[in-house]
């Protein structure tokens, strides 16, 4: 997976493919219909649940974490491989779909479990809890599924003319790897691992942040009311939110920034490795040391942020300078910084703004 690949010519080539071809503004624009259609399906599902199960007060309990997870996973799967397995709508329900749902849910479950051997490596041979065995089994099943997708895409390419407007990420990767030096790595392995890391990272980050954003708004009703008033003023009540509206939703942008500040999806970021001995703030750091940046602490530093533990989107409206989340301002780096900046930042922000705006506007 290129996210954990050391800096090298191979990493540079793979990063170039990911940033300039898979997650470029043009590619995201071509696949805009995927985001819009999945958002519409989810809103219809949510309304259907409400209309069937509402009580006398007109309220109904909904597990939004699962809804956000299914929504983002469907969007990412369609963009990566043209597949749709989760939620309602026209989701497949054949054997492949059921298998894929089971495997991906198991993957995300294992992704968050506490493994004793991570803290006490000498106990690894015991495999306490059976997690290592489960991870190996899940990894093998995931590889089989993605291998099937890859073979399916190859057959489709060989039997029809290419249509660039209908290409998903796997189609793009099949073309892109022909023209780059993979430094001895197998092309199929590179394509599969890249697609898998895009699915895993894209789904988890967006789903987690949407859950936190909604939770924060429900616990701060004044901010919720202000966001809905902005939506009524910008969008109105006669139509649904469009992506073209998002740039005009200033307060909504502040809500997303404040959510990313308080609850960054990767609270310790992506680990970095020192390639040479150096001195940082008076401390000697030897070559090979792994570095983790504590984003949780950085984003709640009282020297930088006033009332750092409070949810106050207004702080981003009243700052003397605009602070973005794209790695230009080191006090707020939820997506990382430098050449290891998350390549999916544009996609992530588009999804966060579109889903939250549509949800608040509709309900």
Swiss-Prot record:
Record-level Gene Ontology MF annotations: heme binding; iron ion binding; monooxygenase activity; oxidoreductase activity, acting on paired donors, with incorporation or reduction of molecular oxygen
Induction: Down-regulated by methyl jasmonate (MeJA).
Cofactor field: heme
Keywords attached to this entry: Heme, Iron, Metal-binding, Monooxygenase, Oxidoreductase
Coiled coil: none
E.C. number: 1.14.-.-
Entry superkingdom: Eukaryota
UniProt binding sites for heme: 342
Pfam family, one: p450
Protein family (similarity comment): Belongs to the cytochrome P450 family.
Functional description taken from the UniProt entry: Probable heme-thiolate monooxygenase.
Name of the protein: Cytochrome P450 CYP82D47
Source lineage: Eukaryota, Viridiplantae, Streptophyta, Embryophyta, Tracheophyta
